[in-house]
Amino acid sequence: MNVFWFLPTHGDGRYLGTAEGARPVTLPYLRQIAQAADDLGYHGVLVPTGRSCEDAWAVASAMIPLTQRLRFLVAVRPGVVSPTWAARMASTVDRLSDGRLLVNVVTGGDPAESEGDGVFLKHDDRYVVTDEFLGIWRRVMAGETVDFTGQHLRVKGAKILFPPLQAPHPPLYFGGSSPAAHGLAARHVDVYLTWGEPPAAVAEKIADVRRRAAAEQRTVRFGIRLHVIVRETSEAAWAAANDLIRHLDDSTIAAAQQAFGRLDSEGQRRMAALHKGRRDALEVSPNLWAGVGLVRGGAGTALVGDAETVARRMKEYAELGIETFILSGYPHLEEAYRVAELLFPRLPVERRTAGVSPNLTGPFGEIIANDIVPHRSQS
């Protein structure tokens, strides 16, 4: 099991939908989160993309020299940049990070944002662009010189001179809920990502992508994007969930849902359908809470509960085939520690910390009464 954390380049805070308790995005703050994730043994961090965020590639490049082993899942936007240019970017970051780049392919689900970036295409046409883009990108990254003429993209003599460290290219991650997205995942990507839907819905998506990948004679791994609200007791966790949305009023929720309504993302539609813009029935599956999605686009659900319960829910997703968990929590610095401390001991996490010598076996924790070495409880 690989567990990722999240760099909140669109802002952070203690509450949703308000400036109360908010934190600005600064280099020192992002550095704290990245270094905490590195020291705690997270596999990597997701760096989000979109006009609501700082640029993902610039942020990842700033964090790389400040970390030792942390991987960076960074978005590339087909149609916004050329596949050859994107290949150069990816190869350079992979080389300079000593092979710590992972590439998140984002087709985009906001027509207004896409048009602002110069992309005037309908939903399925954007997936055609992404398909052509990845066909070129993968070949260029593998060292080929590519001539290609497609429906939307054309290159002649496309190549890069500095190859990536990870051959044939850094792993490709991708999420999407439409049939077009599933077909593209089957043809091109290494890891298919889903937002945190109830297990039965996730199982259906996994089965469909697996079936399509088998028809392409490929295999695909699977991951899930979730928020987490974990505490030592269930009561404390649910109190924290309610506290997260304590400042939300009906007008803020309605404005957010109206904004989401103009998107043509099937994944966003499915997120909104879980809560229907109402705050009175947010537990949409055992311990799966849709409160985040009242005002946050994209991943809108959180696993809520005590550590044993949340770990059990994660293992249930793992039994469906999920290997990668991309988690987050508010505020992201404190919750990076809480999630690692409460969940990692209860999960089969592939964990290699950067800040602890492999020869350092203890003691861990403050010495008791100046004489007694503390031990972890067996409960």
Swiss-Prot record:
GO terms for molecular function: alkanesulfonate monooxygenase activity. Pfam families: Bac_luciferase. InterPro entries: Alkanesulphonate_mOase_FMN-dep, Luciferase-like_dom, Luciferase-like_sf, SsuD_RutA_monooxygenase. One of its GO terms (biological process) is alkanesulfonate catabolic process. It catalyses: an alkanesulfonate + FMNH2 + O2 = an aldehyde + FMN + sulfite + H2O + 2 H(+). Its EC number is 1.14.14.5. It is an enzyme of class 1 (oxidoreductase). The keyword Transferase does not apply. Keywords: Flavoprotein, FMN, Monooxygenase, Oxidoreductase. Catalyzes the desulfonation of aliphatic sulfonates. PANTHER family: ALKANESULFONATE MONOOXYGENASE, ALKANESULFONATE MONOOXYGENASE-RELATED. Belongs to the SsuD family. This is Alkanesulfonate monooxygenase. It comes from Sorangium cellulosum (strain So ce56).
